[in-house]
Amino acid sequence: MSIYDLNAYEVLQTEDLSDLKSKGTLLKHKKSGARVLLMENDDENKVFTIGFRTPPSDSTGVPHIMEHSVLCGSKEFPVKDPFVELVKGSLNTFLNAMTYPDKTVYPVASCNDKDFQNLMHVYMDAVFYPNIYQNDKTFRQEGWSYKLDNPDGELTISGVVYNEMKGAFSSPEGVLDRVVLNSLFPDNTYSVESGGDPEVIPELTYERFLDFHRKYYHPSNSYIYLYGDMNMEEKLRWLDEKYLSDFENEPVDSEIHLQKPFTEMKEVVQEYSIASEESEEDNTYLSYNKVIGTTLDEKLYLAFEILDYALLSAPGAPLKKALLDAGVGKDISGSYDNGVYQPIFSVISKNANVEQKEEFVRVIEDTLKDIVKNGINKKALRAGINYHEFRFREADFGNYPRGLMYGLQLFDSWLYDETKPFIHMQAIPTFEFLKEQVETGYFEELIQKYLLDNTHGSIVIIKPERGRTARMDKELADKLQAYKDSLSKEEIDALVKATKELEEYQEEESAPEDLAKIPVLGREDISREIAPIYNKELETSGVKLVHHEVETNGIGYTALLFDLSGIPEEKLPYISILQSVLGIINTKNYEYSELFNEINVHTGGIGTSLELYTDVTKVKEKEFRATFEIKGKALYPKMDVLFSMMREILMESDFGDEKRLKEILAMLKSRLQMSFLSSGHTTAALRSLSYTSPMAKFKDDTDGIGYYEVVKELEENFEEKKAELIANLRQIAQQIFRKDNLIISYTSSADGLALMEEAFTKIADTLHTEEKEAEIPCEIHCVKRNEGFKTSSKVQYVARTGNFIDRGVEYTGALQILKVILSYDYLWQNVRVKGGAYGCMSSFNRIGEGYLVSYRDPNLEKTMEIYEGVVDYLKNFNVDDRDMNKFIIGTISNIDRPMNPAAKGSRSMNLYMNHVSAEMIREERDQILDAQQSDIRALADVLQALLDAHELCVIGSEEKIEEQKEMFLEIKTL
């Protein structure tokens, strides 16, 4: 029976999506008005999404708090946190929920049919029948609440979203993104912050929170998406009978209104906080922003992706080069946001100064006028088109399911015109159209119309203010104290009581009979088979080649791995600088802008990285292998071009362009600073591990705080350091880019191998052959520092680390289960639910390194105390068989991720380089599947060993770190 025979639905459109190997169908549920879209294909990684148009009217963050709260229990699944129960006990390949400026979406994915149905069931129940109406405790936990432990205590505000957004508002990039959006749309929903402004979140009442759900969480306002290889008729019938038929079609006013164009550009100035010791000079962000039509124009939608590449994103692109040459900022970037109804094109200059605003605007507009007059670089346009078309055809979204990313892109048109859901799924004709326009003046006309003549734009200035965080914290504390002083004794007692009741609620465990309602798989549903390993050792042109034979749809993925042994410790940061400059500096035959375009016209791109491997059969020796890797991908007939361009980058790069090197150092410094605010948890964990782990110290010196300190020193003292920098880059390149230093990894089908071997001859004998200096083994010196790094952030990233193998405890597969147990039970309940942090996680690897870390955490000392309690938690670990099965299934879910061809090849090579055999993986899988509670209790020794190391690092607010200064051996400003 076809879906057309289902009487509950009306078929509105069918679409041949052959470029995506799919058939598209748009339906409407007759009774409820729910919109339903199907993408049928043979992809086993099935996706379900339900989304709602949720335009906020203020910055209280109600869409965001709602997204968190509906996943905290529902009618059929009345447990306190079904989301966490699913994470612990399902085979999901994706499970999350996301709040956007105008929509909220709830996607799930799984390859297992039974599991997929379970995920759909829990999510449908969550959005339509959440337990938020039963009491206000979920709202107070996830959103915000006053916290007063005793009548004489300090009144504070807590809440998961509240603390998450405090962290988000600490990042200048986050502030910039919000102010740009708000500045361009003062009269519609984009004028406010859907995630919530921490200053405004406490204005949200419980009743207004419930009103938001009543208004927007109705099938009439819903968008349901099903993707993959499944029985669509069965799913549609279930949706109808189980949920949609319970509702009548109701008009829901959720329309996203277009902003009336401006008659002149607006200017907005906003401050952001920097640490008291930071300089305000060269710390301003300037942004030039224009509104570009609507997302319903599929040609414009892609054309500005191409223009973003050609004008801004590519190294040496004209707008980027002009601003750098003028000295307006040190890191120039572009942004094209086509995920809102009216897309935004931005030119952003970081590390600039307020007084440069006029020059910033003048340089941009003069450069654009010159481009319109003299024509845009045609090769840059072709490179941009090929770059985006290659990615569309390859559909490699990394760890994210393909169907998930297609679904999110559908919303770019479907949300604003329900008759046009597929327009961005049929991109090949649009790419063909754009190729035809390269020589016609089409792109120049777009620049004139949308960037020069268009007055619907803004200039946004985000300028630094020293101590702003401390000032705002004091203002909030004074405000809360004044509020407390205004309360009667009865009102204060009521706050203390409410605080205690929320804590008691958080302490309560869900009833066993409620937990039993969450559908789970059994261990018998899990295969004991491991994923295949595709490694075949060959030799080509005298070099070891590891071939990974998989079907790649005609694309060859190659990596050249150069061994880094023999590089002394003091030169490690220079390896990373070398890795960063190659491909974006001039070579013998190309200026760097033309080099990048040449690569992207013919290939799928070339990139470089530093990787670390260890022989897992010899972990106690603490030896590891570091490699410099250059990776690229191309269609088989273009492999010769790919290797030719790799050779150009490795052997012909010009390190003598001092001006370009200084530009790159400034960009690196800026981006490292950004990463400390956005990914402080990984930075803190790495730094803490580096106190005793040579491998982690190598990583920190090439990608962490140690690296940042060297880059900062070089950039700020460039004139006196430049000769040393250039000499080091040349010497390291000559030392490592050698044929006798090389292993090749290549992923392709069998017929792609011969073409690769033939193409490789172009590079094999041109690598360095001159005699090397005598190599001295690299000795890495670790020093225990236990550091606190002060930033302008309002939240902390708190890391405890240690090596358990050093203390006589062996690795076991059960540690992978422990990661799930800690991250979604002990740490989740204590650090996130009770502590209010946005995230918390743990990790344990085969070489004995382990860590506990929190993310956007309002606490410091309290979190450290929670870490100390983990050993007792494990010693007393006691769950029933059903819960134990859930933890095991959640662990396997993390391991059994579907892989695209590139991932199959890179995983196989990773195992090869780490000396991990199929037998080891099979043993680990068996240890996971056969684990008992006693195995988990035995892991208390692992955590005791980790804590006994007494290694810690915290990145966070000046105030919190100074309050706990006795915790640290060193305190620094980052």
Residue ranges of each PLM-predicted region?
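His/Glu-based metal-binding/catalytic segments typifying zinc-dependent metallopeptidases
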Residues: 40-42, 49-51, 162, 166-170, ...
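M16 family metallopeptidases and their MPP-like homologs
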Residues: 45-55, 81-129, 136-147, 174-199, ...
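Active-site His/Glu-centered metal-binding helix of metallohydrolases
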Residues: 62, 66-70, 578
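Generic recognition of flexible, low-complexity loop/linker segments
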Residues: 94, 210-214, 273-276, 319, ...
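Non-catalytic, conformational "gating/processing" segments within enzyme and secreted inhibitor domains
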Residues: 158, 210-242, 704, 726-760, ...
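Extended, regular secondary-structure scaffolds
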Residues: 211, 223, 232-251, 374, ...
